Structure formats: C-alpha cells, structure tokens
Amino acid sequence: MMQSKPGVLMVNLGTPDAPTSKAIKRYLAEFLSDRRVVDTSPLLWWPLLHGVILPLRSPRVAKLYQSVWMEEGSPLLVYSRRQQKALAARMPDIPVELGMSYGSPNLPEAIEKLLAQGVTNLVILPLYPQYSCSTSAAVWDAVARVLKGYRRLPSISFIRDYAEHPAYISALKQSVERSFAEHGQPDRLVMSFHGIPKRYAQLGDDYPIRCEDTSRALRAALPLPAEKIIMTYQSRFGREPWLTPYTDETLKSLPSQGVKHIQLICPGFSADCLETLEEIKEQNREFFLHAGGEKFEYIPALNDDEGHIALLEQLIRHNI
C-alpha cells in the first residue's frame, strides 16, 4: 500500500525579475496573454498588446516598480518568500514550495521540486482570499498544464478561497485594530479590493460576492459603526466598465463629504506589492490629500504576520 506524502504549493500572481522596462515587458506579455485575465480574441488582442500596450506601459510601470523595489527584490516576491519560510517552519514535516502564475519562481519548477520529494498529495494554496476566474482559476489551469507532462499524478487538494475563514477575518481585525491604536480611529475605513471587469461577474465569476462576504464579516468584527466602513475596487485597466465604486474616485470625493481622516486596507492582497505600495499608499493617498483630506494611513497587507501564517497552516492541515 502506497503511503501518502503531502506537499504544499503556494501560488501568487507573479512579478518581474527586475524594475526595468525589458523585464516588465516580458512579465506583462506573459500575464496579459492569459485568456483568464484578458478574454479578448487573440486575433484582436495580440497586435494591440505587443504593438501598443507593452511598448507604452513597460517604461511607465518600470518607474513605478523602481519606487517600491526592495533590497531583496520585488515586494511581492520578498513577502511571499517570507510566508513560505514561516509556513515551512511551522510544518517541518511537510515540504512547502512557492510558485508564481507568471514570472519566477515558476510553477513547473515548484511542482517538479515537490514531486521529486515523493509528494503524493499535492495541496494547492492560491494566495487569493477571494476566488476569481482571473486569479484562482488561472492557477488551476496552469497546474493542469504542468501535470499533463507527468505519467504519475498526485492526488490534488485545491483550496478555492478563504474569504470568510474565521482566522482570516481575525488576522484582518487585529491588523486594523493595531492601526487604530497607533493612529486613532478614522472618519472612514476603506476596504479596497482589486477590481475585475463587470462583464466577468455577469458571466458567473462570484468574485464580487466573495469580496462582499469578507467585507460583511470584517464589518461585524470591528469596533466601528458599519456606516463608517466603505468597500471599493481598485486597479481598473482598459476601457470597459469594472466593478464599482472605484477606489480613486471614492477617495477624491470623501473630503467634500467632511471626511478628513481615513485608513485604508486591501483585504484581497495576501502580500504587499505594486498595487498596494505604489497605487494605494502613494497615488491614492495623494488623491485624498489633494482633494482636501488631512490624514491617510495605509494598513499593510498581512504578509508574514503570525496570525496570517497560522491561518495558512490551518487551511493546509484541513486539506491534507
């Protein structure tokens, strides 16, 4: 009888290898070519992507990455590595590997490392608290493509999401309360989630429902009146309508409503990255202050916070 050996594959979106136009062009080409991310016909999308979007966006995005790049590398990779290391320390009997859907470390290498260690029960943990076809489902597709090359397949446990998990809500609550203790209670707490095109939700993606589930659970857990907690969506791209209300437009409008002090958390990001450190902490802060706001504090992602790592361990052990 074959003895079961579990192994964990942690997956996040990915990051360029360097804050340069060349590296970012390579990364964005892979990311934006995934039909789960952009479902426009390749006949229309490929020339637009390679002829217009990549040449124009890559230099601009490179400057943004340079503003947040850490000594150890890209923030997303740095924090994801710390998560992997902390999780492995809590589960020394179970191999834990990190793979990115796009860029490095890539999924084929991570899966190969696990299978080479004799893993027969592969637990896949996409680091997306709220399921979306453009993130979690893309992980499923990528893993399936890798495993097509193997004769002998492991059993698979795929953690779809954890939007309402009590340990996740507790970790978020503690993070918010630490910020309140340090900076005082704000006029508004803004919960900003990454957006997706409205059309994706209309076609069946339950991502906005899962974001609302997280928001409702966190509202109930916090010592702040529900009307002082706002849910928004950020990072829209392209011309079609995305989920609303938009974070940037909301922050620009709040000061005219008498809101002078806000704190902002991004519950859907398991690790800090360009979208939190530059788009939110820098750009959106400026939008709010320029519109007449007085105090803005960004509440960091859970990163390698002890409560976050404990949550991830619970998710994994429940699926072994």
UniProtKB/Swiss-Prot annotation:
SUPFAM superfamilies: Chelatase. Its main location: cytoplasm. It comes from the Bacteria. Keywords: Cytoplasm, Heme biosynthesis, Iron, Lyase, Metal-binding, Porphyrin biosynthesis. One of its GO terms (biological process) is heme biosynthetic process. GO terms for molecular function: ferrochelatase activity; metal ion binding. Disulfide bonds: none annotated. It is found in: Cytoplasm. Fe cation binds at residues 194, 275. It catalyses: heme b + 2 H(+) = protoporphyrin IX + Fe(2+). One of its GO terms (cellular component) is cytoplasm. CDD domains: Ferrochelatase_C, Ferrochelatase_N. Catalyzes the ferrous insertion into protoporphyrin IX. NCBIfam families: hemH. Belongs to the ferrochelatase family. This is Ferrochelatase. It comes from Yersinia pestis. The gene is hemH.
